[in-house]
């Protein structure tokens, strides 16, 4: 641990507040809150942690904290700091999941619509519905029962809906505000849980029509009753008080938290939301952060009541969200919380089971690959690929897969130093020589299998260096691509012989992942270098710009395009003196062809 960290830990206050963990670049990588800052922040640097938390702690080189006057203030501040800094280790709920609502527009001649965007436009919104089908079925029923306007624009003549008795034709007839209000009130009553009353009224009208021998009308009313029954059958009542509430439950296992939310609307359980994320705080703290972000999401509306598990501070939730929050001790609400907790626990168990199965399949693929190639199981695979464009900025990349999974800390990038022009074979010789000379010198682990992204020439060049120069005899295979630049097969041996793998086998998928990953890593590195060289060459002729300032500009702007779009003030912000900023601006503005 850094000495300055020890000094800062020693003077932490025993008050509530927020803390910001920073990496060596000074970037905020995690924001947390605590009832007692001293205890919480120190806990990161003492005791044992799971691997995920160890990764976080391993990146921390500094921290700062903000003392607050209460836990509520700390919770509010934490959410604002997360939004401001977007730390990579914090959960960030996305606004990508929306639910459909039925809307009665506030137009002079109102309409019924399905929408996923709730606006402050004086319209009346009902929902959310669990899915689009449920919303459309309900709207279809309401369209049959209540003759509101259907057309988005007023036509010049009556449409089919008028002839079907489903519209009053405000396009050609006068429909008063009172008539519309009466219809809208009926729709609101239905959507607010009054469907039983509406059904009873329709039933009475049906019998009256039958007695008057109006059989067509009676049949129409009977069909409407049947539609109501069909829709309501799908939305069984679980609470008799018709209160809109969200019921929360959660579970924690192996450093992960799952939160399940049951949406209860008008007494019916209509939908649930499942969120799963890594957790670095105490479960209760993680849950409070989650619920704060949950209701900041534009698709989640605060109901009349929020129901939380017994371990959560419901008073804090209530003050923070300004909604009634309860912790039921018995009854149906307690049953729902326990059901949400149970579902969260099951979801986590499924997650870890699937991870375990995936690991089993991956290990099996590694073992089978060894058998197919006639070698020992290649638990460690290293793969190489070259990248250049017409010989410029030639680079190579090496990636490592351990137990069938990418080991990104083992990846290495190489600028080609000894080869002039686009010579793939000599580039492969150089990079293999550099990699394994260093491995021997530093006692680094050697791979069980080396994969060269290329054909016989690449394989021969790499094998020659490995065996004849370094005296290493490590199994080596070439990955051959087809005409579409996709993984085709392996070649191995001397002379190289093709090894055909079944395309739907796990070992083939493993090779595809290796090839795609090494290609991605190499080409990304090449593009970075190419971008830097373009910027640096573009800046070569500007007076007052040396290597140091080139690096500063490259780091600040990232691309020549952004530099050409920048103002003089932005160059000053990047650390350039005013006169140099003016020179750069003038030069780049004049050089339109750059």
From Swiss-Prot:
<comment type="subunit">
    <text>Interacts with UvrB in an incision complex.</text>
</comment>
<comment type="similarity">
    <text>Belongs to the UvrC family.</text>
</comment>
<protein>
    <recommendedName>
        <fullName>UvrABC system protein C</fullName>
    </recommendedName>
</protein>
<keyword id="KW-0227">DNA damage</keyword>
<keyword id="KW-0742">SOS response</keyword>
<dbReference type="InterPro" id="IPR004791">
    <property type="entry name" value="UvrC"/>
</dbReference>
<dbReference type="Pfam" id="PF01541">
    <property type="entry name" value="GIY-YIG"/>
</dbReference>
<dbReference type="InterPro" id="IPR047296">
    <property type="entry name" value="GIY-YIG_UvrC_Cho"/>
</dbReference>
<dbReference type="GO" id="GO:0006289">
    <property type="term" value="P:nucleotide-excision repair"/>
</dbReference>
<dbReference type="InterPro" id="IPR050066">
    <property type="entry name" value="UvrABC_protein_C"/>
</dbReference>
<feature type="domain" description="GIY-YIG">
    <location>
        <begin position="14"/>
        <end position="91"/>
    </location>
</feature>
<comment type="function">
    <text>The UvrABC repair system catalyzes the recognition and processing of DNA lesions. UvrC both incises the 5' and 3' sides of the lesion. The N-terminal half is responsible for the 3' incision and the C-terminal half is responsible for the 5' incision.</text>
</comment>
<dbReference type="GO" id="GO:0009380">
    <property type="term" value="C:excinuclease repair complex"/>
</dbReference>
<feature type="domain" description="UVR">
    <location>
        <begin position="196"/>
        <end position="231"/>
    </location>
</feature>
<dbReference type="InterPro" id="IPR036876">
    <property type="entry name" value="UVR_dom_sf"/>
</dbReference>
<dbReference type="GO" id="GO:0005737">
    <property type="term" value="C:cytoplasm"/>
</dbReference>
<dbReference type="GO" id="GO:0009381">
    <property type="term" value="F:excinuclease ABC activity"/>
</dbReference>
<keyword id="KW-0267">Excision nuclease</keyword>
<dbReference type="InterPro" id="IPR010994">
    <property type="entry name" value="RuvA_2-like"/>
</dbReference>
<keyword id="KW-0228">DNA excision</keyword>
<dbReference type="InterPro" id="IPR038476">
    <property type="entry name" value="UvrC_RNase_H_dom_sf"/>
</dbReference>
<dbReference type="InterPro" id="IPR001943">
    <property type="entry name" value="UVR_dom"/>
</dbReference>
<dbReference type="GO" id="GO:0003677">
    <property type="term" value="F:DNA binding"/>
</dbReference>
<dbReference type="Pfam" id="PF02151">
    <property type="entry name" value="UVR"/>
</dbReference>
<dbReference type="Pfam" id="PF22920">
    <property type="entry name" value="UvrC_RNaseH"/>
</dbReference>
<keyword id="KW-0234">DNA repair</keyword>
<dbReference type="InterPro" id="IPR000305">
    <property type="entry name" value="GIY-YIG_endonuc"/>
</dbReference>
<keyword id="KW-0963">Cytoplasm</keyword>
<dbReference type="Pfam" id="PF08459">
    <property type="entry name" value="UvrC_RNaseH_dom"/>
</dbReference>
<dbReference type="InterPro" id="IPR001162">
    <property type="entry name" value="UvrC_RNase_H_dom"/>
</dbReference>
<dbReference type="InterPro" id="IPR035901">
    <property type="entry name" value="GIY-YIG_endonuc_sf"/>
</dbReference>
<dbReference type="GO" id="GO:0009432">
    <property type="term" value="P:SOS response"/>
</dbReference>
């Amino acid at each position: 641990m850094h000495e300055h960290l020890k000094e800062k830990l020693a003077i932490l206050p025993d008050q509530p507040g927020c803390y910001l963990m920073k990496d060596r670049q000074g970037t905020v990588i995690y924001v947390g809150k605590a009832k007692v800052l001293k205890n919480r922040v120190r806990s990161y640097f003492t005791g044992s942690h799971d691997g995920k938390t160890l990764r976080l702690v391993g990146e921390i080189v500094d921290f700062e904290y903000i003392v607050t006057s209460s836990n509520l203030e700390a919770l509010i501040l934490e959410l604002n700091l997360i939004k401001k800094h977007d730390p990579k280790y914090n959960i960030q709920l996305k606004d990508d999941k929306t639910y459909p609502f039925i809307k009665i527009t506030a137009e002079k001649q109102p309409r019924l619509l399905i929408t996923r965007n709730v606006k402050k436009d004086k319209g009346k919104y009902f929902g959310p519905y669990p899915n689009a089908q449920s919303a459309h079925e309900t709207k279809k029923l309401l369209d049959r029962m209540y003759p509101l306007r259907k057309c988005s624009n007023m036509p010049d003549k009556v449409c089919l809906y008028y002839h079907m008795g489903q519209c009053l034709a405000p396009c050609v007839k006068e429909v008063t505000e009172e008539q519309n209000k009466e219809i809208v009130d009926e729709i609101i009553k239905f959507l607010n849980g009054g469907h039983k009353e509406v059904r009873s009224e329709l039933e009475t009208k049906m019998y009256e029509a039958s007695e008057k021998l109006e059989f067509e009308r009676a049949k129409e009313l009977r069909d409407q009753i049947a539609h109501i029954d069909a829709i309501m059958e799908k939305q069984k009542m679980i609470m008799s008080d018709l209160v809109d509430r969200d019921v929360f439950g959660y579970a924690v296992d192996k450093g992960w938290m799952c939160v399940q939310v049951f949406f209860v609307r008008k007494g019916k359980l209509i939908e649930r939301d499942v969120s799963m994320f890594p957790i670095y705080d105490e479960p209760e703290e993680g849950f409070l952060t989650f619920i704060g972000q949950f209701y900041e999401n534009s698709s989640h509306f605060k109901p009349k009541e929020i129901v939380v598990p017994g371990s959560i501070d419901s008073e804090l939730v209530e003050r923070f969200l300004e909604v009634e929050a309860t912790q039921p001790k018995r009854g149906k609400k307690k049953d729902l919380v326990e059901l949400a907790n149970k579902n969260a626990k099951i979801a986590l168990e499924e997650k870890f089971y699937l991870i375990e199965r995936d690991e089993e399949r991956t290990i099996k693929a590694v073992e089978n690959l060894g058998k197919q190639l006639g070698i020992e199981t290649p638990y460690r695979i290293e793969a190489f690929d070259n990248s250049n464009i017409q010989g410029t900025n030639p680079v190579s990349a090496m990636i490592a897969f351990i137990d069938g999974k990418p080991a990104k800390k083992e990846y290495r990038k190489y600028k080609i130093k000894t080869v002039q022009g686009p010579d793939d074979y000599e580039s492969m010789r150089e990079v293999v020589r550099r990699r394994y000379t260093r491995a021997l010198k530093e006692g680094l682990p050697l791979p069980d299998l080396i994969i060269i992204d290329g054909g016989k020439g690449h394989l021969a060049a790499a094998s020659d260096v490995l065996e004849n120069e370094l005296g290493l005899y490590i199994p080596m295979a070439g990955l051959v691509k087809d005409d579409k630049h996709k993984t085709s097969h392996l070649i191995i041996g001397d002379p190289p012989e093709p090894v055909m793998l079944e395309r739907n086998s796990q070992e083939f998928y493993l090779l595809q992942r290796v090839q795609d990953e090494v290609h991605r890593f190499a080409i990304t590195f090449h593009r970075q270098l190419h971008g830097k060289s373009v910027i640096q060459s573009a800046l070569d002729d500007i007076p007052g710009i040396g290597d140091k300032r080139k690096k500063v500009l490259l780091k600040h702007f990232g691309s020549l395009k952004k530099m050409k779009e920048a103002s003089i003030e932005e160059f000053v912000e990047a650390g350039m003196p005013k006169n140099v900023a003016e020179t750069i601006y003038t030069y780049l503005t004049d050089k339109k062809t750059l």
